[in-house]
Amino acid sequence: MLEEAQADERRAALDLALLRAIRERLEAGFGERPDGDAIALRGRLEAEAAQVVVRGAAAAILAADRYGLKVRAVEDADAAFAALASGGLAVLDVAAARPWWGRLLARPELSVVAALPDDRRAQPQALVISARKSGPTGEDRSFWVTDAAWPDSRIVETLSQAGLAAEPLAARGGLKLFTLAGYVQADDGRLIDAPGALSGVIGAAPVF
């Protein structure tokens, strides 16, 4: 037989506040793209659950839009990576003066888990880094770094011959960053003969 729980006034007040908030949000309606509303809500829930640090102007704007205003700016990539030791997320500009993304090759415990904006028609301006690995969603793009000095067009053609659709994203300090269509893992056999003495996948992100 089920027993009636004892009254908890504080919990009842919280439940009532939650119901009111849900009702008000539903009454406010949805935007032109319901998936956009879902993405924004997901970002705010993630921000409530974990610390978000940012480095760079574009990263600050995009992170605030995705995760809300509870983001904290840090001085450099070192500080951003250090903050990840206690969990959370780091959002950094792709077009930074130094190729911080290349350092992820030596930090396999960290990886790209999202890219902003994440619209498939837009070029990523900031990458979201986490100590947690991302998994395939069915609609992803991966990020690959190389020190190959070849022209971008030759690198793209070589990867295409191996079955990978690549696009150049950034180049700094002798390193180049490319996006690869789909979810590509670090040990993908198609990358065995990839251009460059130093190269590798540094993570993947869903696209919408």
Model-derived features with residue positions:
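Domain-level signature for soluble enzymes in the chorismate/prephenate branch of the shikimate pathway
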Residues: 1-208
